[in-house]
């Protein structure tokens, strides 16, 4: 069974195009999948930076501090801040929440 929906054949009058029955369920399903794939590809290209930045940075919210005493949380924040505050002339201070 062929998935071709359009066939060009040589006739006496020249080249003609004979289309097969487009109500074939396989042809309809392939068309729908093709259109959805094209739409998703276009959206991916348009929103590439937003989507992948969200996956890369948005889902990483750092280690959980649930059940950790406040003093240890503050110590962790201070360590993170010290790692950033190497040289105030070249680095921007980042306030951790």
Swiss-Prot record:
The record's note on its domains: Cytoplasmic tail plays an important role in virion assembly and morphogenesis.
Keywords recorded for this protein, A-Z: Disulfide bond, Host cell membrane, Host membrane, Host-virus interaction, Hydrogen ion transport, Inhibition of host autophagy by virus, Ion channel, Ion transport, Lipoprotein, Membrane, Palmitate, Phosphoprotein, Signal-anchor, Transmembrane, Transmembrane helix, Transport, Viral ion channel, Virion
Predominant subcellular localization, coarse grouping: virion
Record's protein name: Matrix protein 2
Family: Belongs to the influenza viruses matrix protein M2 family.
Extra facts: When the channel is activated, one or more imidazole moieties of His-37 probably become bi-protonated.
Virion surface side: 1-22
Subunit structure, interactors included: Homotetramer; composed of two disulfide-linked dimers held together by non-covalent interactions. May interact with matrix protein 1.
Entry GO CC: host cell plasma membrane; membrane; virion membrane
Site location (Essential for channel activity, possibly by being protonated during channel activation, and by forming the channel gate and the selective filter): 37
Lipidation (S-palmitoyl cysteine): 50
Feature type site, description Seems to be involved in pH gating: 41
Entry's localization field: Virion membrane; Host apical cell membrane
Organism: Influenza A virus (strain A/Chicken/Hong Kong/37.4/2002 H5N1 genotype X2)
Membrane topology: Single-pass type III membrane protein
Origin: domain of life: Viruses
Short name of one Pfam family: Flu_M2
């Amino acid at each position: 069974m062929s998935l071709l929906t359009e066939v060009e054949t040589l006739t006496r009058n020249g080249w003609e195009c004979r289309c097969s029955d487009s109500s074939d369920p396989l042809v309809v399903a392939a068309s729908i999948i093709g259109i959805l794939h094209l739409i998703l590809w276009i959206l991916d290209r348009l929103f590439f930076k937003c989507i992948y930045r969200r996956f890369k940075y948005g889902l990483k919210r750092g280690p959980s501090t649930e059940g950790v005493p406040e003093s240890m949380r503050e110590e962790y924040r201070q360590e993170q801040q010290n790692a950033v505050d190497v040289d105030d002339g070249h680095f921007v201070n980042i306030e951790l929440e």
